[in-house]
């Protein structure tokens, strides 16, 4: 197959190694990775959006670019508490146990004051992401207890996708330095809101 550098997505240094975002396809053009279909869909949207705009008489537009800012929701759990739950350590989610004593009536948590330990984690995370050129505009508590959200600055779709993959990896590494575990599973706890990724 062919390996091609995606020059629209920035190269970066991770753990003293230069990482270059690439696309990989077969000699016949079949996609062998997850990036090639994304790049092709961006091209298809550009082509069809231009066609529609030109039909409506807007001939000045030469290119249509998609952008996205995937807000990443996550749970932060103390490492000692996490290690006591084998289902969490093996599956990243709870499989048994009693339902929480309260449901979603803890509305004081959503956008409430961030606990100092979590604020330190978020500040450290921001710095690590900044080193990779990933800018976050908002971090806040989410609805469920111990649930939080990071909202990045919008950027071109393929760059935002690369940034989100890096963000999830860095979130877990930074959490470990703070004695925490970052759970990215969409529904780690039954009976409370799950984590989503939305625009």
How should each PLM-predicted stretch be described?
Residues 1-184, 192-197:
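Glycine-rich, acidic/polar active-site loops that bind/position phosphate-bearing ligands
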Residues 189:
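A short glycine/serine-rich beta->alpha loop
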């Amino acid at each position: 197959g062919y390996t091609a550098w995606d020059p629209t997505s920035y190269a970066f240094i991770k753990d003293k190694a230069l990482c270059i975002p690439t696309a990989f396809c077969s000699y016949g053009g079949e996609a062998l990775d997850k990036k090639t279909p994304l790049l092709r869909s961006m091209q298809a949207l550009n082509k069809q959006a231009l066609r529609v705009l030109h039909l409506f008489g807007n001939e000045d537009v030469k290119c249509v670019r998609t952008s996205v800012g995937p807000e990443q929701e996550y749970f932060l759990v103390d490492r000692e508490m996490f290690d006591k739950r084998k289902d969490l350590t093996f599956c990243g989610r709870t499989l048994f146990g009693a339902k929480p004593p309260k449901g979603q009536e803890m509305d004081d948590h959503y956008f409430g004051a961030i606990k100092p330990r979590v604020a330190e984690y978020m500040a450290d995370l921001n710095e690590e992401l900044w080193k990779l050129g990933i800018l976050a505009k908002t971090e806040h508590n989410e609805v469920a207890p111990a649930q939080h959200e990071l909202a990045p600055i919008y950027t071109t779709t393929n760059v935002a996708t690369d940034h989100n993959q890096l963000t999830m990896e860095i979130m877990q590494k930074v959490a470990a330095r703070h004695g925490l575990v970052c759970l990215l599973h969409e529904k780690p706890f039954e009976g409370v809101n799950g984590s989503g990724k939305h625009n």
